[in-house]
Design a protein with these regions (language model features):
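Glycine-rich NAD(P)-binding loop of Rossmann-like domains
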Residues: 1-20
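C-terminal helix-to-coil terminal segments
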Residues: 126-224
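Gly/Ala-rich phosphate-binding loop of Rossmann-like dinucleotide-binding domains
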Residues: 22, 26, 112-113
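Residues at the starts of beta-strands that form the adenosine-phosphate
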Residues: 8, 30-31
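Conserved acidic E/D residue at the C-terminus of a beta-strand in Rossmann-like folds
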Residues: 36
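Short, flexible hinge/linker loops that cap or flank conserved catalytic cores
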Residues: 1-5, 26, 86-87
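Rossmann-like adenosine-cofactor binding region
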Residues: 39-135
Length: 224
């Protein structure tokens, strides 16, 4: 087995989730890196011990482990394609707990089969739920789970409390917390507004339809 000590670990995005992940990694005695469209304040970088990269290419070429914590939008859809993965260190790892479509499905499989990537882990798929014949189920050196791996009983209690607060504020006509806000008055809003780019990512509905076979088709049809 292996451990993280001494490795270069980088996060793609350092918003609420990305920064929290980096803080949790600090006690493991790793060298922490991040890329984000908006650089964190100098005092935060110093406190956590972060090295900033002004491009995702710079980040992935430096780190042995890359964790993806950015939202899915036009600029990040298919970001980890064959070209970007080729810039990663030989034998590096990707952890994707953001969105499945941020990574090119076949590019991940090819990199694992060729040995360029040592491993890929995550709890996000495209389409989701993943059909039985999804290639990520059978590719080598993967650590995939359903998109429920972080849903502990404690987390579910926090989700419920957050939903209740949002509904209570909505019915009372009160302003929502910035961290709970995504869109306001027709525009991006809240603490994560700067993380997105204008436009829409592809719906993926036609691509997803290609995977509708057997149990998956029955499940989709039952939800209509």
């Amino acid at each position: 087995s292996y451990d993280l000590e001494g490795m270069n670990v980088g996060s793609v995005a350092a918003g609420r989730i990305g920064l929290d992940a980096l803080k949790k990694l600090k006690p493991f005695d790793v060298k922490l890196h991040y890329y984000d469209k908006h650089r964190l304040p100098a005092e935060v970088e110093e406190e956590v011990g972060l090295t900033y990269h002004d491009s995702v290419e710079s980040l992935v070429s430096t780190c042995e482990v890359v964790t993806i914590n950015c939202p899915l939008h036009p600029e990040t859809e298919g970001l980890f394609n064959k070209e970007l993965i080729a810039k990663m260190k030989h034998g590096s790892y990707i952890v994707n707990t953001a969105r499945g479509k941020i990574c090119d499905r076949q590019a991940i499989v090819d990199a694992l089969e060729e040995g360029h990537l040592a491993g890929y882990a995550g709890d996000v798929w495209f389409p989701q739920p993943a059909p039985n014949d999804h290639v990520w189920r059978t590719m080598p050196n993967h650590g995939m789970t359903p998109h429920t791996s972080g849903t502990s009983l404690s987390a579910q209690a926090r989700y419920a409390a957050g939903v209740r607060e949002i509904l209570e504020k909505l019915f009372a006509g009160e302003k929502q917390r910035d961290e709970y806000t995504i869109v306001s008055n027709g525009g991006l809003a809240g603490v994560g507004a700067h993380s997105y780019t204008e436009g829409s990512s592809t719906s993926g509905s036609e691509e997803a339809a290609e995977y509708r076979t057997g149990e998956f088709t029955q499940w989709v049809d039952s939800r209509k």
